[in-house]
């Protein structure tokens, strides 16, 4: 996703982008990675750095800028849980999702799930569809089949006995990305 953000915002070719994996030595702390949080936080910081690069390319070529660093920063400010401030902010982005299922009346099994999610800007729609499908399967398992027995906070069941859906048990899923 970050490469897509660079190509789109810096207006450079994909072949000119070298992706260097993250390192705690060179990467500032950007909080946890949950859901698509890093697409927002790291992505916005990346976009801001790209705008600086694009401005620099007005006067120099990309080759002349090799070795120069451009920094973008984005801080997703929220209030801690249980905060006493009026109208605390718990999230920096919100979405909306709705699901519909088609059930076989004879067997009681789900034949099809339709999930429509308003996600804001889907940077990688195919990946977004995959996240929706994964969320549907996890939700179905949580609601219908999964059991996670604990004894003093420790799991007591083997992984294969948790009631997770197997691939051949998953119904057709139609993911709709509302951008």
PLM feature spans:
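C-terminal catalytic domains of large/alpha subunits in multi-subunit enzymes
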Residues: 2-179
């Amino acid at each position: 996703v970050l490469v897509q953000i660079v190509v789109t915002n810096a207006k450079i070719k994909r072949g000119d982008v070298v992706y260097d994996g993250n390192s705690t030595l060179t990467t500032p702390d950007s909080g946890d990675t949950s859901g698509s949080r890093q697409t927002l936080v790291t992505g916005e910081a990346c976009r801001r750095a790209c705008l600086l690069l694009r401005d620099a390319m007005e006067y120099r070529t990309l080759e002349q800028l090799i070795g120069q660093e451009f920094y973008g920063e984005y801080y997703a400010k929220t209030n801690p849980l249980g905060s006493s401030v009026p109208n605390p902010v718990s999230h920096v982005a919100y979405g909306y999702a709705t699901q519909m299922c088609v059930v076989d009346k004879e067997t009681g099994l789900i034949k099809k799930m339709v999930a429509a999610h308003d996600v804001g800007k889907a940077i990688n729609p195919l990946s977004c569809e995959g996240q929706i499908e994964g969320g549907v399967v996890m939700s179905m398992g949580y609601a219908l089949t999964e059991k996670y027995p604990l004894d003093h906070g420790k799991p007591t069941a083997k992984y294969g006995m948790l009631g997770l859906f197997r691939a051949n048990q998953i119904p057709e899923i139609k993911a709709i990305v509302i951008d």
